[in-house]
UniProtKB/Swiss-Prot annotation:
Keywords in alphabetical order: Cytoplasm, GTPase activation, Nucleus, Phosphoprotein, Protein transport, Transport
Stretches the record annotates as Disordered: 1-66
Similarity-based family: Belongs to the RANBP1 family.
Protein name: Ran-specific GTPase-activating protein 1
Cellular compartments annotated: Cytoplasm; Nucleus
Record field: compositional bias (Basic and acidic residues): 1-17, 32-66
MF terms in GO: GTPase activator activity; small GTPase binding
GO cellular component, one term: cytoplasm
Record's subunit section: Interacts with GSP1 and PRP20.
């Protein structure tokens, strides 16, 4: 038996992996020490500060903006200030288009008989709903005649020689329709009363 065979067999233990050098080693050679991780106490302090900031902030701030331009209130005149309303009724107004040979709707709204306090003249004024644009504006002249509209007992047709709804006086043939026969009859009655007033004015 050789001398090599006589050597005792020793179990080799697994060598432990070397640990990385600590931060102290680096600091010895001018290296920067590793920063300590934030402790639990630091986290609590941060949360407390955030909470205090939240308590200081108003829950519902009152935001107020000053207008850039100050607008003054303007009184809009309708030219009805010096007139008295004698009669008012809801109606739909049509005008006859001679070129197209058909009736065209002019507007729906309140039709008013207005008496001027200075001249005592009575005129018809009708404004469209929502837009309030004038669709009829003329004196109820004594020569105007209301005629029944064919096929309807709640509308009238009459020729107007000078309607100024569009600015300049124009001649139109109007048809005015009401919600009921009673309103149509009442309109005729008030129309003829206004004609009598205008005869004397």
């Amino acid at each position: 038996m050789s001398s090599e065979d006589k050597k005792p067999v020793v179990d080799k233990k697994e060598e432990a992996a070397p640990k990385p050098p600590s931060s102290a080693v680096f600091s010895m050679f001018g290296g920067k020490k590793a920063e300590k991780p934030e402790t639990k106490k630091d986290e609590e302090d941060t949360k407390e500060e955030t909470k205090k900031e939240g308590d200081d902030a108003p829950e519902s701030p009152d935001i107020h903006f000053e207008p850039v331009v100050h607008l003054e209130k303007v009184d809009v005149k309708t030219m009805e200030e010096d007139e008295e309303v004698l009669y008012k009724v809801r109606a739909k107004l049509f005008r006859f288009d001679a070129d197209a040979k058909e009736w065209k709707e002019r507007g729906t709204g309140d039709c008013k008989f207005l008496k001027n306090k200075k001249t005592n003249k009575v005129r018809i004024l009708m404004r469209r709903d929502k837009t309030l644009k004038i669709c009829a504006n003329h004196i109820i002249a004594p020569e105007y005649t209301l005629k029944p509209n064919v096929g309807s007992d709640r509308s009238w047709v009459y020729a107007c020689t000078a309607d100024i709804a569009e600015g300049e006086a124009e001649a139109f043939t109007f048809a005015i329709r009401f919600g009921s026969k009673e309103n149509a009859d009442k309109f005729k009655e008030e129309f003829e009363k206004a004609q009598e007033i205008n005869k004397k004015a």
